[in-house]
Amino acid sequence: MSAPAGRLQPQRFAALPNPVTAENKFWRSFKVPVVAKEYSAITSIHFSAESPYDFAVTSGARVQIYGASSRSVKKTIARFKDTAYSGNIRKDGKLLLAGDATGLVQIFDLSTRSILRALDAHQFPVHVTQFCPYANTTFLSGSDDKTVKVWDLSTGAVQYDLSGHEDYVRTASWMSATRLVSGGYDGTIRLWDTRIADPEVMSFSHGEAIDVVLPMQSGSTVISAGGPSIKVWDLVAGRQTPTKKLSNHQKSITCLAMNSENTRLLSGGLDGHVKIYNISDWKVVHGMKYSGPILSMGLSPDSCNLVVGMSNGTLSQRTRRITKQTSSKTPFLGGVGSAFGVVGKKKQIYKGENDEFYVEEARRKRLRPFDKALKSFCYSDALDMVLENGSPVLIITMLIELLHVGGLRIALSNRDDLSLTPLINFLRKYIRDPRFSETLCIVTSTILDIYGAALGGSVMVENAISKLREKVEQEVAVTQRANELVGMLQMLSA
């Protein structure tokens, strides 16, 4: 007894290269953007190192604290006489440090928003401030007076006055409790060590005005950004040439950030793009486009919030949602009675094992209309049905099945222009696909064999055949050029 006819199973083809990588999926998971509008350019974004990772946004003459979970303003500090710069939250989340255009450096208590210190040792605008992550009572400031100062919070006194830059200092960062790196508009990166008499221990020339320097966690590498390029410097080798130069932006790069695992570098620029680099090979693995020139950027320590500030006052917040996986297993509590089904203090009735098992019979799937037509040897109707509503893979599967059962010529015969044109259009669309080309070439030859003498009888069919011919000629030309290229490569490698 023969087996009943089953459903037509789609053909399986070799998988094509997937243009969407796991890296793309991760960065595209930053969704649900929340856009806020400030009154002036957003010059600084800084995340707290403490959960829930609130962040400070510096814009105009105020610093606002945003909640990472609510993504709205929690506190506003507006006690500045002029434009504020570089709002920086201490690692314990209790204090805020910021400079302003008058040269004043202020420390605020975030719980009360009161001013704890107001320091005026700088004579020009202070564009960079940063608490030392290794000591709660130490912080730095960099100013347009070409100096970097290291302060003692408890006394409010300058511990070290680092001078050496020949132009504005616009960026500085801690490398350890005693070492820091700075960059300025003189195009130099300078490494300082406060333990020695002459604190400037090393300098490099970036070649353009530097907007940001970022030391890596290893302590042996510094990244600088100035103009449209990023340069990577090896401090151990001490060479004056960078180990790597990245030129993926069209305009000046204004901000850099690193993820918490120190495996990805993010850069933002005036071209409105954010680029993500894999630091193992320094290649761009993903990119994002924003509506305006980017001035500042921050990535939360848990890599769930990406915040970007722009020159037009737009603040964009993108969030990556993490689904919490809860264990379905009940924790087993040992002790007396646990072997008898008693968990904790709740008693349960012990049940014996069930020796009877019921196996449900798998339900057979119903045949689709084109399956029934194929089963009834109505080959032309089956082909028309999949051409009308089927996917390309299903149509190819039907054509291959018709070839196997010897029904292809029957399915293609006795067609008018209205039923033949959709098939020719399908051939034109997919004949260059390497997965389908072998089968579609056979179908094309069969159509020309059947209707070759009568092609001029219908304008619709003649136009469809002409377009199909153009596609075939294009593929032949590409193949010829590919063969020529192979020959050239063989000559070079011989």
Curated annotation (Swiss-Prot):
Presence of the UniProt keyword Transcription in the record: yes
GO molecular function: snoRNA binding
Placement of WD repeats on the sequence: 37-76, 79-118, 121-161, 164-202, 205-243, 248-287, 289-328
Any one Pfam family match given in the protein's UniProt record, by short name: WD40
Keyword terms of this UniProt record: Nucleus, Repeat, Ribonucleoprotein, Ribosome biogenesis, rRNA processing, Transcription, WD repeat
Domain of life: Eukaryota
One Gene Ontology term from the biological process aspect of the record: maturation of SSU-rRNA
Principal location class: nucleus
Location in or out of the cell: Nucleus, Nucleolus
GO annotations of cellular component type: cytosol; mitotic spindle; nucleolus; small-subunit processome; t-UTP complex
InterPro entries with a match to the protein in the record: G-protein_beta_WD-40_rep, U3_snoRNA-assocProt_15_C, WD40/YVTN_repeat-like_dom_sf, WD40_repeat_CS, WD40_repeat_dom_sf, WD40_rpt
Subunit field text: Component of the ribosomal small subunit (SSU) processome.
Known function: Involved in nucleolar processing of pre-18S ribosomal RNA. Required for optimal pre-ribosomal RNA transcription by RNA polymerase I together with a subset of U3 proteins required for transcription (t-UTPs).
Protein name per the record: U3 small nucleolar RNA-associated protein 15
Species of provenance: Schizosaccharomyces pombe (strain 972 / ATCC 24843)
Gene this chain is encoded by: utp15
